Amino acid sequence: MPKLKTHRGAAKRFKVTGSGKIRRNKAFKSHILTKKSAKRKRGFRAGDLVHERDVAGVRKMLPYL
């Protein structure tokens, strides 16, 4: 059986925490920032975890994670 391929876009966006959860960055922080409040932009800096319903799909894209 051939090796499974890693989804390269997903590999750049997700990392695993020490406890095995999948970490992600928040969206909406790269441009059109003038209308967003400072508080909202600070919130984008904080990382977040992938929702439990999405974990299976991410793991399928990243078989060697």
Curated annotation (Swiss-Prot):
Keyword Ribonucleoprotein: yes
Entry protein name: Large ribosomal subunit protein bL35
Keywords: Ribonucleoprotein, Ribosomal protein
Record family assignment: Belongs to the bacterial ribosomal protein bL35 family.
Alphabetical list of Pfam families matching this protein: Ribosomal_L35p
Gene3D superfamilies noted in UniProt: 4.10.410.60
Cellular component annotations (GO), alphabetically ordered: cytosolic large ribosomal subunit
Single GO BP term: translation
Recorded GO MF terms: structural constituent of ribosome
Species per Swiss-Prot/TrEMBL record: Magnetococcus marinus (strain ATCC BAA-1437 / JCM 17883 / MC-1)
